[in-house]
Amino acid sequence: MMRGCHICKLPGRVMGIRVLRFSLVVILVLLLVAGALTNLLPNIKEDKMLTLRREIKSPSKSALDSFTLIMQTYNRTDLLLRLLNHYQAVPSLHKVIVVWNNVGEKGPEELWNSLGPHPIPVIFKPQTANKMRNRLQVFPEVETNAVLMVDDDTLISAQDLVFAFSIWQQFPDQIIGFVPRKHVSTSSGIYSYGGFELQTPGPGNGDQYSMVLIGASFFNSKYLELFQKQPAAVHALIDETQNCDDIAMNFLVTRHTGKPSGIFVKPINMVNLEKETNGYSGMWHRAEHFLQRSYCINKLVNIYDGMPLKYSNIMISQFGFPYANHKSKM
């Protein structure tokens, strides 16, 4: 009887073992599925990290392949809007910074934005004082290595800008621009400022220049920081004359590099639009303008204890362009 009873309980025990095995299989399958899902999580995180890396790297790539336009303006809203519209179509332009020198007056930011959208962001920077050197601040919005600085009455063709930017990429430590000037030492040892109408400064054929004006030029954004570190007397001179910040920048660059401060690029189509505005006339119309420029050169020589500017006769022009069509009116 005892054996019979023992034998009768065997089927139940077998069923229990089967249930246990089934449960173990289910648990094992669940563990495998959970493990597989867990293994997928690092891939998701890795994808996110790759995306994040791309986002982090993209500004550096943009910094090399694009430039920021800085334009200082005063009493020329009509021209400003026209120029902003023109420069929106320039390739490689990353951002536009408008240095608004009409102190206490509201800029045309709302009007500009209301007529958008625009392909290139424009940032208006109202100033608390109308100073010439406002445009040489270290703007936190500048995210590119190259800065294009353009006066608010100057229209430069997209073709000229694309070409000049390509030259700057080859010579990123110099000013690459469209308007050359030079200094000349007189017999008395006093320096004069001028253009190609002055005597040739050295032996040999052809003419030379020693400065490239920054109002139509590309230069490295690091020079904005270096400008802030120049002697206080330099800043005071610019504020005193409301002039000569471009001459000071040429002194800075050539002192920093030991090379000529800039390279002259011959423009194909660059136009001064000052006659088309109802606003402010440029400083170069003032009778004392060139006298001030000569004054600044001599003052800077005293501040820096010497003349650092170097002459150059290099002019770069676009190969193969039909020069009969040149329209430069500068």
UniProtKB/Swiss-Prot annotation:
Glycosylated residues in this chain: 75
Record annotation: effect of changing residue 246 to A: Abolishes enzyme activity
Keyword Mitochondrion tagged: no
Residues binding Mn(2+), per UniProt: 153
Cofactor: Mn(2+)
Role played: Glycosyltransferase required for the biosynthesis of heparan-sulfate and responsible for the alternating addition of beta-1-4-linked glucuronic acid (GlcA) and alpha-1-4-linked N-acetylglucosamine (GlcNAc) units to nascent heparan sulfate chains.
The protein's name in its UniProt record: Exostosin-like 2
Organism: Mus musculus
